[in-house]
Amino acid sequence: MPVIKVRENEPFDVALRRFKRSCEKAGVLAEVRRREFYEKPTTERKRAKASAVKRHAKKLARENARRTRLY
């Protein structure tokens, strides 16, 4: 859980914004959304594999685009 220290004479809005930013960087909300419902291990593995395939395809597309531009 991200912790921030409220500075002297710091407005509440600014402290809240800093806290939200630190939560976003730590990935707290994404983790909560991911754990909201139970996901079977097979479904979790399937989703992770699909994500890896998509990431790999994206990487190949980037490399291919870079190769075609250099002529």
UniProtKB/Swiss-Prot annotation:
Compositionally skewed regions (Basic residues) per UniProt: 46-59
Basic and acidic residues composition bias: residue spans = 60-71
InterPro entries attached to this UniProt entry: Ribosomal_bS21, Ribosomal_bS21_CS, Ribosomal_bS21_sf
Whether Chloroplast counts among this entry's keywords is no
GO terms for biological process?
A: cytoplasmic translation; ribosomal small subunit assembly
A Gene Ontology cellular component where this protein is annotated is: cytosol
GO MF: rRNA binding; structural constituent of ribosome
Query: Which family, according to UniProt?
Result: Belongs to the bacterial ribosomal protein bS21 family.
Q: Matching NCBIfam families, A to Z?
A: S21p (TIGR00030)
* Subunit and interaction comment: Part of the 30S ribosomal subunit. In stalled ribosomes contacts ribosome rescue factor SmrB.
Q: Which domain of life is it from?
A: Bacteria
Keywords associated with the record: Ribonucleoprotein, Ribosomal protein, RNA-binding, rRNA-binding
What name does UniProt use for this protein? Small ribosomal subunit protein bS21
Span list, region Disordered: 43-71
Q: What is the lineage of its organism?
A: Bacteria, Pseudomonadati, Pseudomonadota, Gammaproteobacteria, Enterobacterales
Explain the purpose of this protein: Probbly involved in recognition of ribosome rescue factor SmrB in stalled/collided disomes; fusion of protein fragments to its N-terminus decreases ribosome rescue in the presence of SmrB.
